[in-house]
Amino acid sequence: MAGAGSQHHPQGVAGGAVAGASAVSPTAAGPGEDSSDSEAEQEGPQKLIRKVSTSGQMRTKTSIKEGQLLKQTSSFQRWKKRYFKLRGRTLYYAKDSKSLIFDEVDLSDASVAEASTKNANNSFTIITPFRRLMLCAENRKEMEVWISSLKSVQSREPYEVAQFNVEHFSGMHNWYACSHARPTFCNVCRESLSGVTSHGLSCEVCKFKAHKRCAVRATNNCKWTTLASIGKDIIEDEDGVAMPHQWLEGNLPVSAKCAVCDKTCGSVLRLQDWKCLWCKTMVHTACKDVYHPVCPLGQCKVSIIPPIALNSTDSDGFCRATFSFCVSPLLVFVNSKSGDNQGVKFLRRFKQLLNPAQVFDLMNGGPYLGLRLFQKFDNFRILVCGGDGSVGWVLSEIDKLNLHKQCQLGVLPLGTGNDLARVLGWGGSYDDDTQLPQILEKLERASTKMLDRWSIMTYELKLPAKSSLLPEPVAATEEFYMTIYEDSVANHLTKIVNSDEHAVVISSAKILCETVKDFVAKVEKAQDRTLENTVVAEAVASKCSVLNEKLEQLLQALHADSQASRVPPGIGPAIPEEDTVESASDESLGESKDQLVNDIGKPSSQKAVKPREIMLRANSLKKAVRQVIEEAEKVMDEPAVQPSEPVSPSCDYDTETDEAKEDDAKESLSAKTTSQSPDAQASCGHPQTDSVAGPAMATTKENLPVLNTRIICPGLRAGLAASIAGSSIINKMLLANIDPFGATPFIDPDLDSLDGYSEKCVMNNYFGIGLDAKISLEFNNKREEHPEKCRSRTKNLMWYGVLGTRELLQRSYKNLEQRVQLECDGQYIPLPSLQGIAVLNIPSYAGGTNFWGGTKEDDIFAAPSFDDKILEVVAVFDSVQMAVSRVIKLQHHRIAQCRTVKITIFGDEGVPVQVDGEAWVQPPGIIKIVHKNRAQMLTRDRAFESTLKSWEDKQKCDSGKPVLRTNLYIHPAPDLATEEVSQMRLCSQAAEELITRICDAATIHCLLEQELAHAVNACSHALNKANPRFPESLTRDTATEIAINVKALYNETEALLVGRVPLHLESPHEERVSSALHSVEMELQKLTEIPWLYYILRPSEDEEPPLDCTKRNNKSTVFRIVPKFKKEKAQKQKTSSQPVQNWGTEEVAAWLDLLNLGEYKEIFIRHDVRGAELLHLERRDLKDLGIPKVGHMKRILQGIKELERNPPNLV
């Protein structure tokens, strides 16, 4: 349609045409399914509408709802903006709110329906006996508010913005216009819907069909939501109330079969036969009365909240659920705007599968209403259908209500990026709403893992640009570094004299030697340039010689002392050799140092040197350093002297040495710094230098800091403009005391202090600053301005490519390293030339890219994981790198792995920042990323799905008829023997004791409660099912569930206490928990002697070896039903299986089960076929036994051949 004269268009409509009203072929939809769109309809003959002055009526009546809407005209389907007022049961509209004349529409016999399935333009139709009014709202929330207002008028109920939609509790249908691909009949007049494509209305919840003229006469019998909505159909017995079937007549699929007589039911000629809205059972009209009256709720019964469970309301007006009816209910949040408005289709489909009261639209009220409804449940699951932003929204609301211990959250990817859904195993996109039952089934079988969540803390303050922080007189920096030299020498001498620990003495002596040696080299290098003042140069050389002598004397005294002391073997840690090559002039000093280090750890019987002698040597060495500094200051005071280059510190910590080196750094820092506010930390009074900010500090071999090889990837160092030198110990010592830029201390004096910070948001996936954030910001702005251009994932990826290409030319943040400063775990990280920094929590970035460049650990970094409380920091060099990383796993840009990240933004202008795809411009100041909490996430467990599917195939009925949905336990389980009951009781008591000890310890150790809450709740719930006063109530099903949950609790507790990163408890609690854990282990070992529990609790063949405590913690709360017992008993039972010749009929029947031919067990047992006869069966024998299928004969004969070679193990 041209629509040239249209002045206003609804969102998502181009040229005035209705996006959701375009013509669609009947073949566009599958058989029996509703199509996505409806054809445009012209308004029929209209009744003459009275147009008079309505100002009087406007003043006398109260307005229920009013506002601007777009109205479709009859000419060329153009849209025009009109002002609408709903007063009483009449809808008024005019050009604006101040008009005197309004058109009026009588709503006495009106119905309201959405325009189409996807409804991208948020349009709806008001249908009266005389006209149809097509209206369009600004967004979906506004549309639903208008629809609810109109429905409340029809039902004669006062409209108010309630907690839930009125139609959910009133039984009113939720109409939308659609077309059908097969003959469909109206459930009101029972006649066929007219037209080739069967135009009509369909209820989005119960699929009730009606003509548009009949919709107003439809009874309010939509899908039940609460106990009150069931009414007189409720079933009451001695056990309480039960859920009845809710039948809907007619319009059954072609393949429908009666659940009673197993014959075809339904018709394409008339409205006949019935279908239950809950369990999807279909029956003939004649068979309906003989069918079981209680509804089993069907395939999704685990996830459904039955209407009989919502039987009361609390003081706030929210429905209260009865927990006994809900095992693990599912709360569904759908973002109706996600995936090109695909969310609308999923919203309707979930209401058809579940209770409509447990399905919520995030765009209409947010997640609070749903979480408030489920707040009282001890354990429930959440499914978020949308993108990463929707998941973050729900998790933030869970934080406010403090529900992390009660709920596990799964993700159905409908958005653009969907990085979190990829990591959790749910894929990158999902479009097929017909597969939702299978998705719910996989969600029931999902395992649980913990997702680290991080707070983005900001502190805004004005910081001068780095370039303005360069010092005017370079000599001031020299004096500052010389003071640091002197203080460092004094600190390490104090440690050598006072410390009784050999590790501290070794570390301090080694650092002291290198400090003095490097200090002398720097001074000599400076005096070599001082050719004019030879007298001063000779004085400096003399003082340096004296200093070397004093250091030699101290080393000799320490050597003598080490020879005299007795140290137990092995207590001295090995000191790794330095990679640097010692100069020829320092050979004697290096030998003395090595001799000292080697001798301190050796036992000897010589007489100890007096501590006073060591003290004297140390004081003389300190005085010598002071004299050299004084002479050096004289050199710098000479006007003709060229100042020497300032010492550039290094961050090359040797992580192989003892932790005493870190302690030295912290102690020396604490002696110089006090707790400061972020403002004071960011503007320290020391002179500032910048290794990249200007020509005075160009990146050269002498002043470029060495990057920590344990933190920085060698590839990033190769990306730096020059080779890195200065790797002596002096650089390590300097970085423990000063910051090369002088802007912040190298180690934050109070790293955990967040005074003055405010939480900007919470990060679940990743954080970015610079290039990638600017691209995200521009994309978000474009999507807000032109949403119709960003309605599909393909278009969004194309836009990202266009914006990235533009940045390739503009290079807006090519000097980002000059505007920001990075610290990881309080350690300053010198940055190369880059355009952005990314901080990763999950191994998926910007739509599925593994930006870290791998998933496995190597010699430097551990494997990335989202449950280890560790972040990965990478550099973003340009947009080409971001594009290439989608194809090639790049690793040269890795920076660090750390637990906290601090980024300081300098200058007057803000820098783009993005968190999980949401971008903004962050003003200058400080950004800290710290751990907030952990959320329980549902991850798809494909291995468990495969195993369970194989098990379910073996549990098919003997008749060979496949079940609709095989549950974990199909047949009534037999009772337990007396010995088995007693063993289960002992195991339950041991598990209860372990739970008690865990709860006691959790009162002090919050982490214990956070890690084990899910396992403890599941185990307690299973134990409560077994009533100790009635042993006969303990069935095999209940016992199996108890054993699985107790084993899961045992695995989780053991992994937490003795796993890769053990949790250290206080001594009384640790002993009690360990004792209870040991008791549970003993009881579980006894349970493995029960044959039907052996295969559940036995060790797996491919079980992983014991965890290495030195490796990274990758544990999760996934159900580990395989214990860590030794395998001797399993091997013994395997080898003790009897030969095939001695098999009885029971073993033969079990062997048929292994072949998935259990339907022939009765035949073999009736003919008394034992092992000896089985081995001699031939094809004609099987035919005589009554096996008709050739394929089954071949499988049995092939199985007999396998028996002769490898007899199976049948326990």
From Swiss-Prot:
Acidic residues compositional bias, start-end: 576-589, 653-662
Catalytic activity, as annotated: a 1,2-diacyl-sn-glycerol + ATP = a 1,2-diacyl-sn-glycero-3-phosphate + ADP + H(+); 1,2-di-(9Z-octadecenoyl)-sn-glycerol + ATP = 1,2-di-(9Z-octadecenoyl)-sn-glycero-3-phosphate + ADP + H(+)
Region Disordered, residue ranges: 1-66, 562-613, 634-694
EC identifiers of the protein: 2.7.1.107
GO BP: any one term: lipid phosphorylation
Keyword Cell membrane listed: yes
Complex formation: Interacts with RAF1 and BRAF.
Domain notes for this protein: The SAM domain mediates homooligomerization.
Protein name as catalogued: Diacylglycerol kinase eta
